[in-house]
Amino acid sequence: MNLISIATLVIITIGTCFNAIRWQRIAQREHYIPGYISKFYFRWVRSRGLNRFILFITLVLCIVSLFIAYIPIIISVINIYTPVGLSLKSRTSKVDKTERLNRVTYCYYFLVVLVSIFSYTLGYGYFLALAANMFSFFIFDQALRLMFNYEKNKSRPFINDASKKLNSNAIPVIGITGSYSKTTTKNVLAKILDESNNVFVTPESYNNRLGIAK
């Protein structure tokens, strides 16, 4: 590889790592379920004709990149700002930089860098790194999948302790499920029940098992 190709490889890798900002938000909001990052990505691509067009253009540029070294840099910049509508910055609540989110992000970084190292050492130039950039959502899903059992085992003591405390007290427990407005529904219901009962509400938007247990 010449210096231009190596520089391109490094820039692509940095761009792919930067994409973690977007995937972190989705991962946390969807309770770190493997596969949901890709699901949301394709949902946004299908939802707008502009996103479908941009995806088509980037795929064409990937072919062009076989002949022009700087094209992958353009692709990595495009992928930072797309899909349109699924922005890097949260429109509602901010991403909570928890230890779990940091761990899965570090795992993502490791996978991205590993792909780039393989791309270099196996003689593929920057092409494997470019593929990782195009499918960074899939790589983040793999990081979630790799960390899933570890996180499950790590959270089990907290969940078991919380379950014992609840079971040792003869009090009614209300759980609210759904895709949207769980926190709003929880707060409204708590306000109603508080008129004639002592009510304890889980703080803020901690709606997953570990968040509630802690």
Residues of each region from the PLM?
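Short, strongly hydrophobic alpha-helical membrane anchors
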Residues: M1-L3
